[in-house]
């Protein structure tokens, strides 16, 4: 007769433990990092090929109303506007400036979040046992805890966290204004390159007309020589003028090619660009850009960027000074605790935590003073960088 031997509790729980272990290993093996893809590069497919054959990807770009007005006055045909849009979408430095803005905004969000308490929820199971019965009786534990509370929140009595948040905010504003300054600088550079290309094209067209005219005069001189009206020396002189005009034409073609290459480099070798008819002279400066009031000149993005950096430096000084005062941190929690999960929600299983902490630096090897000195020096550097921006628009 077969008898049924009951399995022990530890053996019956073995499948559950194995499943839990496998689940933990599966979660641990998951990777949240995105798949790596090598970025596309604006380089030729083979050595020796032209880089124009590999146009770079262009990011979408828009223009402000003032920029639209300026570009329309400088080039009514719209070619300059297309060049500026291509440059804003292609230029890697400008794209990097935009990413710096996003980085500074994220850092400001992190710093500003320190001013608010962080509410955490947790579930913990602690088990500790010993083979020695006496040690297990004294030090063994089997405890399950579920909690909801605030951990390590600093009570900002002396403004340290507030000043750090203000410094991060002004750094973010300065970075955003720096991006606008870089945008204006790029716009000015593309306008300059476009006008230089147009002027070079006009000089090439003039040189082409002169060379054709010299060639026509040479043919007339040769006909007159055959009729006996001109000597061979006169024909040789006319032929020398033709050679000189051809050399000037070749030089003008090379200059126009360099100017067009510089423009293409700025605009990312856009494939939808076609050369506009060259102009003989650069367009005149729009009237609304002449004799601007000084207050308008002080609104430049680079000047506003410098001012925001100055404000950030001042806030950093305040944070460095607050490091000399006590730092008060608070950890709180409320929840339930039991020696088993099954009794976790029973009556009488409540638990709470209140853990204030006051820290006053006594000996830090001069770190706090050095940080304060550093903040003061950086503030003075910001002042020194700001003053030239105030004077330069008026000069």
Sequence positions of predicted segments:
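Alpha-helix N-cap/helix-start motif at coil-to-helix transitions, marked by capping-box chemistry
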Residues: 74, 208-212, 286, 373, ...
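Small/polar-residue-enriched beta-strand and adjacent coil segments characteristic
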Residues: 32-39, 79-86, 90, 95-98, ...
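Short, flexible active-site loop motifs that bind/organize anionic cofactors or intermediates
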Residues: 70, 225, 242, 296, ...
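Periplasmic alpha-helical coiled-coil/stalk elements that build and connect Gram-negative outer-membrane
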Residues: 161, 170, 176-292
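Terminal intrinsically disordered/low-complexity segments used for targeting and assembly
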Residues: 2-18, 24-89, 169, 253-298, ...
